[in-house]
Amino acid sequence: MRTELTATGLAQRVEGPLLFLRRAVDVGVNEALKIIGGDGRTRLGRVATLEEDRMIVEVLESTAGLGVADTKIAVVGEPISMGLGPNLLGRIFDSVGRPLDGHPPVPAMRRLRIDGMSINPARRDLPRDFIETGVTAIDLMNSLVRGQKLPLFSAAGLPHDRLATAIAERARLRGDSEDRFAIVFVGIGVPHDTAESFRSAMETSGALGHTVMFLNLADESSAQRLLTPRFALTAAEYLAFVEDRHVLVIMTDMTNYCEALREVSASHGEIPGRKGFPGYMYSDLASIFERAGCLHDHAGTLTQLPVLTLPGDDIGHPIPDLTGYITEGQIVLDRDLNRRDVFPPINVLPSLSRLMDYGTGKGFTDADHPALSNQLFAAYANARRVRVLASVMGREGLSDTDRQYLEFGDRFEQDVVNQAAPRTLEESMALGWQTLALLPDAELTRLSNEQIGRYVRGRSRD
């Protein structure tokens, strides 16, 4: 770390959250700066762009009142970092890691760069083991595995904030590792009332005791928004790879992050890509999502559940499209289910957890879990097909088996997907077996005769 250097007379102009300076000092990209205004107020900034004769600094606080002639620049000589230490759980921070809960800063036993630890791919281990979210459509059908990155695709007006809060309150590990579990909850570009509802829900449920919260408000600068997930993931890496905890990071809403990235890119004068987003958005998102994982030489894990809203309900939009290339599946919310008061309105058919097989089945959840999940998928897909037939030819033209599928589809949505309270995996599986009892044995082709006799018909006779 270099000695802090102060320079004056470098500022040329201020545009939104950006400060344009003459390049008269030796700095690097992403290096931290202190910007001292004429009023004596110190603001944090970072070097965003370096050119031959100038540099652009992102100011991470409001630039209101920041002049040009009387602005001083203090060069810190290192990238932006976050001080971390014990007693991190239960704390609430703002966009850039400053306390919002009225308590003093966390005693810094260690300072970590917010752009993440450089992990040799050879050190990575295969994600495995099950995280119970309390949501049947996820736990039973699209299971979340420690070390996975599994996004939740929503749309404007759907209850993704409510679902994210519910998962943060309910999520847990099964077995002896439960006391090593932690949540990092990140609100990105959220309104004040939403941020307060997040905070109130976590405090009321008692989940705040094993949670760290980072809240970026909608009226804060775009530059701050770009740093919020990085500060949060730095705290998560400390919990996972220093304190050896199993950490679940819930980030909502990554669409707000990408919109901020487009805004900042445009203000830099960069050439836009698809729909105005910068061409490097893929690598930028990867620098966030790829911080999830497991390491051979650490007991802790870092799992991500990012939430994003589909602009215009378009799953082919660059934001969900690029996210899908990086992550390992998706959980998809559905407007039609939401209109029918199904909560959570998760459409299990387009949803997918690519790593589900590594955390479910014998030795992880239940030996019959994979078979039950496969049979429910197949049966519900048939039920949706029969609904289309019924809309064309009417119920009178359907066979008896098709009518049974119609009843199964309705019961599956109302009894299995829909839930008013958290469920354990055992409760979710019991509902799944019970719903399959509506179908004849000949249709249960994904189950063995033993499974049909023990779970499906045995339960239907109770």
Regions inferred by a protein language model and the residue ranges of each:
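Acidic-enriched and Gly/Ser
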Residues: M1-T133
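P-loop NTPase catalytic core
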Residues: L140-R461
